[in-house]
Amino acid sequence: MAPLPISSIRVGKIDDVQELIKSKPNKVPERFIREEYERGVVVSSLKTHHLHHQIPVIDLSKLSKPDNDDFFFEILKLSQACEDWGFFQVINHGIEVEVVEDIEEVASEFFDMPLEEKKKYPMEPGTVQGYGQAFIFSEDQKLDWCNMFALGVHPPQIRNPKLWPSKPARFSESLEGYSKEIRELCKRLLKYIAISLGLKEERFEEMFGEAVQAVRMNYYPPCSSPDLVLGLSPHSDGSALTVLQQSKNSCVGLQILKDNTWVPVKPLPNALVINIGDTIEVLSNGKYKSVEHRAVTNREKERLTIVTFYAPNYEVEIEPMSELVDDETNPCKYRSYNHGDYSYHYVSNKLQGKKSLDFAKILN
């Protein structure tokens, strides 16, 4: 899909946050400071401890044998997670620890390179691949306290080869191996989600065609005034599934919006965080929700995440699945649309909660 014309977008000066903390460690530029209403209500520390344990955890080893009680119990947990939270963590997912640690190490090495080296792979205004900040469309738009490096991975035609770095030397090999593992995980998860919706297990894979997969590495440096900034603006994802890997010993940074309150999600060792994207919300006719989420920063600790977005091929027409629509009891909530058109719409606007999904809603 073609990016927006670069000449039509004026984004102003975008400071690199890693360079900021080197030169002015105790100063937060005005363009990063959020209005008080943007910071929202965060669940209290007492409730946070309780809610950490309410974030659903799905044990994928229990879904390997479909004929036992564990399977049906875990499918029920998965259904409730998708319906009530839109987020869950998966354990025993089958991806080797060495694969996970290697991509973390490579990503860390990339962000540690000199700025001049990273600037060889720029994220141009109106695009979402390369190094920099995405979703910036005006000179007065507030910035996130984050550096990003994003790449299209699969199918090959969505890649921009000029943006795949030559350093670190094993970057491409590591990302290829990791992405293959995550792709297989997404296929498995979609089978289980289909079963949880009462669909045949291959329903999503048959409909998606050659699925689109992209990766974004996010680096959140420490911030001297974390209460004034956001690491990543509130948004839902345009994907079908999103897989979040948080670096080892990561501080709490992800927050999800539940009952109008921001709930921190505590990382579990060797777990991956999965969230439902807008595409699954549409396909399930709103039964499973894509949930607004954001990232916050820490005064003392850095945070590194690796995010994979998995979605249907751009040529696929998306609409609520007929099995999940009933004219009387559950009428169609979303119109039919081309997934490529929605993807273009999503990346052509700044992150604003769930506003992007208005593109597909049927307004009564």
Curated annotation (Swiss-Prot):
Phenotype seen when the gene is deleted: Increased shoot branching associated with an accumulation of carlactone (CL) and methyl carlactonoate (MeCLA) as well as reduced responses to these compounds, substrate and product of MAX1, respectively. Accumulation of carlactone (CL), carlactonoate (CLA) and methyl carlactonoate (MeCLA), 16-hydroxycarlactone (16-HO-CL), hydroxycarlactonoates 3-HO-CLA, 4-HO-CLA and 16-HO-CLA, as well as methyl 4-hydroxycarlactonoate (4-HO-MeCLA) and methyl 16-hydroxycarlactonoate (16-HO-MeCLA), compounds related to (11R)-hydroxymethyl carlactonoate (1'-HO-MeCLA).
- Binding-site positions, Fe cation: H235, D237, H293
Report the outcome of G253D: In lbo-2; increased shoot branching associated with reduced activity toward (11R)-methyl carlactonoate and very low conversion to (11R)-hydroxymethyl carlactonoate
The record's SUPFAM superfamilies line, in alphabetical order, gives: Clavaminate synthase-like
| Listed GO CC annotations | cytoplasm
List the PROSITE patterns hit by this protein, alphabetically.
FE2OG_OXY
Q: How is the cofactor bound?
A: Binds 1 Fe(2+) ion per subunit.
Q: How does it assemble?
A: Monomer.
Q: What does this protein do?
A: Oxoglutarate-dependent dioxygenase involved in the biosynthesis of strigolactone natural products, bioactive compounds promoting plant fitness and soil microbe interactions, but preventing shoot branching. Catalyzes the hydroxylation of (11R)-methyl carlactonoate (MeCLA) to produce (11R)-hydroxymethyl carlactonoate (1'-HO-MeCLA) in final stages of strigolactone biosynthesis, downstream of MAX1 and CLAMT.
Q: What additional remark is attached to this entry?
A: The branching phenotypes of the lbo mutant can be rescued by exogenous treatment with the synthetic strigolactone analog GR24. However, the lbo and lbo max4 mutants do not respond to carlactone (CL).
Report what the protein is called.
Answer: Protein LATERAL BRANCHING OXIDOREDUCTASE 1
The scientific name of the source species is Arabidopsis thaliana (Mouse-ear cress)
Q: Which gene encodes it?
A: LBO1
